[in-house]
Amino acid sequence: MTSSAIRINKKPVVLSGIQPSSGMLHLGNYLGALKSFGRMQDDYTTYFMLANLHSMTFPQNPEVLRENTIRIAAQCIAAGIDPAKSIVFLQSDVYQHNQLAWVLGNVCIFGEAARMTQFKDKSGKQGNISTGLFTYPILMASDILLYDSAFVPVGADQKQHLELTRTLARRFNAQYGQTFLVPQPFECSIRIYDLQDPAVKMSKSSATESGTIFLLDSPDKIVKKIMRSVTDSEDVIGYDRETKPGVSNLVVMYSCLTDCTIEQTVNIYSGKKYSVLKKDLSDILVEVCTTIATRTNELLDDKNYIRKILVTASEQARGVAQKTIDRVYEKLGVY
């Protein structure tokens, strides 16, 4: 294992991240983001950010957040984010994120931020919301633009935020001259749904824990959750999100874990009962999650090693970010 600095080269930059507000990653995080990001590490300069500043948009227990950050870092590394290939850093350790966010906040028009559907959805469900929730997309834009990110993996819920980032980059460039690289989306089409309510995404905050496979779940829990997952009465394995959302969800999981296409998976299980697919999927998930859990526990036995990775990577990220801030401040006349 190594925590030495990653050599920055001329490969296109890909930036991704995850909030450590919960100490548990689930299957949706793994298949929808971590697995594909892990495969990018050889072909791109990859930054993976533990977005603890974004976690502050809702109240956090400081000690719990600190512990969860280490736990999430361990799980991400165990799931394939290699600190020898990626710059795995802590957002709060790179103060330039806040510096650029202030600049971009003065480039963003109030109405643009107010139109963000995620803000409208969350603010509609909460009572007293923070200004930080409103400015969340601006900080996200700062995260992306600081590192000259060429590509950003995004799901459907973040596409609007990335489009705002692109708008702000183009606006700044038009006003002050070429400064920012305008990032392109890597659209993540993989969506894993709740096992008990396949109309909604799998989430750490599902209505019932049985709807979510956590990467650190025990083998028994994984088997029970899969075998009890909602399907339908037809017992015909196929893929149709409208009429067969439950079994379609299982088909997607199997396909992602085995690198099969949807069509190949459906053909493999043609004429077989749901129980056969569930049994095979359970076996695969137990193997994958046990491997991740074992590695996670090894890493958590030496938390100082994880902290050293984050400190080293954050120092390197600051060096890159400062070059962007210097460029921006010079254009603005505040340097």
Curated annotation (Swiss-Prot):
The keyword Transmembrane does not apply. One of its GO terms (molecular function) is ATP binding. It catalyses: tRNA(Trp) + L-tryptophan + ATP = L-tryptophyl-tRNA(Trp) + AMP + diphosphate + H(+). One of its GO terms (biological process) is tryptophanyl-tRNA aminoacylation. SUPFAM superfamilies: Nucleotidylyl transferase. The keyword Protein biosynthesis applies. Pfam families: tRNA-synt_1b. A motif ('HIGH' region) lies at residues 20-29. Its main location: cytoplasm. L-tryptophan binds at residue 143. Its EC number is 6.1.1.2. GO terms for cellular component: cytosol. A motif ('KMSKS' region) lies at residues 201-205. Belongs to the class-I aminoacyl-tRNA synthetase family. Homodimer. Catalyzes the attachment of tryptophan to tRNA(Trp). This is Tryptophan--tRNA ligase. It comes from Tropheryma whipplei (strain Twist) (Whipple's bacillus). The lineage of its organism: Bacteria, Bacillati, Actinomycetota, Actinomycetes, Micrococcales. The gene is trpS.
